[in-house]
């Protein structure tokens, strides 16, 4: 491959992809599909640019509508608007889009990634927050909002970290549904304990028919709830 030509293609791909999100705010499924058909080879550097600006899930209008629909499908004992607690929200991009869809979202993050190496770590991520973000540890956030939260969103929990398992245990303890965005067991999110708990104690289902992962990535969006026989 001609290296100069490839670099030019990458620049074009990045510019087009950036335009999809800056000019249209949130592109459609068809726009993203068209982009992948045109620039599949250049998608890896573009993913890096997207992740450091917005976050790991590739969001479209349809995906946000599907997440909103899944949240609204949950039984809310008190009536009214459901409250969403987003943990480890990064830039707050997902939460900001759900707010625009009428959701009541509390976005939280401990911001530990800001202390990472900007070259080899996450120190250069998310220079622009998209909504108000409360700086608090994930488990502390659950304890603080357990009586308000109807659903917890956990997106791309760190690989081999026990955090996802601890969060899921808290969700089960307090009967709070979870929306999990990430890869399955053997992928790059969560750890074995997290997936063991999910298999043994939870029901899960896809909530997005339109989600498109970046090439080489195998994430999807799941609604995770306690198995009915375990609900007291």
Where are these regions (language model features)?
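A short SAM/SAH-binding and catalytic strip from SAM-dependent methyltransferases
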Residues: 149-162
